[in-house]
Every structure is written in C-alpha cells, then in structure tokens.
Amino acid sequence: MGIIKGVLFSIVLINLSLVVFCGYPRRPVDVPFWKNYEPSWASHHIKFLNGGTTTDLILDRSSGAGFQSKKSYLFGHFSMKMRLVGGDSAGVVTAFYLSSNNAEHDEIDFEFLGNRTGQPYILQTNVFTGGKGNREQRIYLWFDPTKGYHSYSVLWNTYLIVIFVDDVPIRAFKNSKDLGVKFPFNQPMKIYSSLWDADDWATRGGLEKTNWANAPFTASYTSFHVDGCEAATPQEVQVCNTKGMKWWDQKAFQDLDALQYRRLRWVRQKYTVYNYCTDKARYPVPPPECTKDRDI
C-alpha cells in the first residue's frame, strides 16, 4: 500500500512539474502602480484611481503623458493590462516598451496605432538591438482593445524575446548572434508607457489627423506586473547574465513549444498587416534573423 501511495505521489509531482514548466511565463501578480512605476512626464495628465490599482493617461491639445519603471532590468517577464482609447482615435499612439538609455540602445516596443471609429487598431511591434531597429511588424487584434482590459507582456532571456497578447505569442525574436545579429544581453532596460499625438505618421501614414473635438483621450492601465533581474551596476549585470539562475532561463523558456508555434502561425496567417521579414522591396534578401524566428 505504501509503495502504491509513493507511486501516486510521484505521478502527482510529475504532473505538477509539467504544469509549472509548460513554456508559459508565470502568472502575473496584480500590484498597484506605485510599487514598480513613477510618472516620467506630464504627471498632471495622469490619474490614479483606487489607490493606484488603476492608472489613466490623458491626452489633450496641451499634452500627453507617460510613466516609467523605478528600476532597470536585464531579463525577466514584464506585463500590464491596458484598455485603449475608444472611439475616433486616429493619430493617437499608446506605447508600452522597454528601452536602455544610451546611443546604441536596445528596445522592445508595443505601439498601438489609433484609427477612425469602426476601424480596427493596429499593433506595431519593433525590436532595436545596438541602436538598429527597422524590424517592424504590424497586426490587427482579434478583439476590441477599447472595450476592456487585455494583457500585453514581454518575456526576455538570453535565448529569445517573446511578445504576448493575452498569453498568445504574436512575435518571437531569437538570439541570432551566431548569424551576426546583435541581441540585447548586456544593457539593462527600464519599462515605459506613454500616450501622445503622432498624427504625422500613426494612421494611414499621417493622412488621418487627430480630431481634437474628441479630446481628452484616455488610455487606462492596471496590473503592473514586473518580475525581472534588477541591474543598476556592472556587477548586477554580471549576476543577471548568469544563465540558469532564474525561472526564465530554464529549458521550457528557451523556445516556444508546439502549441505556441501554432498560435503564432495563426496570428501570422489571419491578422498580419505588415512583416519586415517578407517585405521584398525593402529587403530583397531577408534579414538573417527572420529564418530562425520562423517569420518566412
């Protein structure tokens, strides 16, 4: 009887380990704004509700607004839930991104490009490494991002960067140093978000202008989750670069699993608006990382 119980207990442990290491980031922890963030500009255009569990950015003719993380990080999992500007939002951009602060900077971007009433939002992502970007991908979302809060997150380790929308991977950027492509592995980044007027380019290449009669525009945020390796000194950077020390370094997070690849392919086939990897006019020879990222 004892042997049977032991076997059953072992099976339970194995099943639990499969659940924990299934290839998806840990479930975000809902925390208020002030735990991890602070205003970065135009604090008079930021509203804090319910003790900071909900935060609104306001855009009008006089100003937009933005906030940033208090700490810098090298690798981790970063997410927040957002409800985008509703109605006629042409010309308005809401951004959530990670960025280092130097000339040859690294950056991981979400940019939500507003549109005329009834037209879908476009989500543009981009990855800068060593100051080089030009890796734009644009998709439509499969839901209305103005009707409720949805999760947007980044998983970043030494192997790859994965960008998620509601746990669906919409982009993977793998470490392609072996192909001569730089990868962000030694420059800590802060997390930023902002709401601003970009009607010179955001909607139909700048043809659609912001309708200020609809101002103020509001983007709302909640669940300010940060689970990263803090790095403010060279010594801390070295510690964060020690592989295997954190959960995001484990084998399950070194690549997408089969289900995640199917979901990524679903996004590619049904919702892609633009992908730099397949823009032959711009890149007659696809950039080297595109094959490894399964974008072509």
Curated annotation (Swiss-Prot):
PANTHER family per UniProt: XYLOGLUCAN ENDOTRANSGLUCOSYLASE/HYDROLASE PROTEIN 8-RELATED
Name of the protein this chain belongs to: Probable xyloglucan endotransglucosylase/hydrolase 1
Alphabetical list of InterPro entries matching this protein: Beta-glucanase/XTH, Beta_glucanase, ConA-like_dom_sf, GH16, GH16_AS, XET_C, XTH
Native species: Solanum lycopersicum (Tomato)
SUPFAM superfamilies linked to this entry: Concanavalin A-like lectins/glucanases (SSF49899)
Molecular function GO labels: hydrolase activity, hydrolyzing O-glycosyl compounds; polysaccharide binding; xyloglucan:xyloglucosyl transferase activity
CDD domains xrefs: GH16_XET
Encoding gene per record: XTH1
Enzyme active site: E107, E111
Top-level enzyme category: transferase
Post-translational modification: Contains at least one intrachain disulfide bond essential for its enzymatic activity.
Binding site for xyloglucan: E111, Q124, T125, N126, N134, R135, E136, D200, W201, G205, R282
Annotated signal sequence range: 1-22
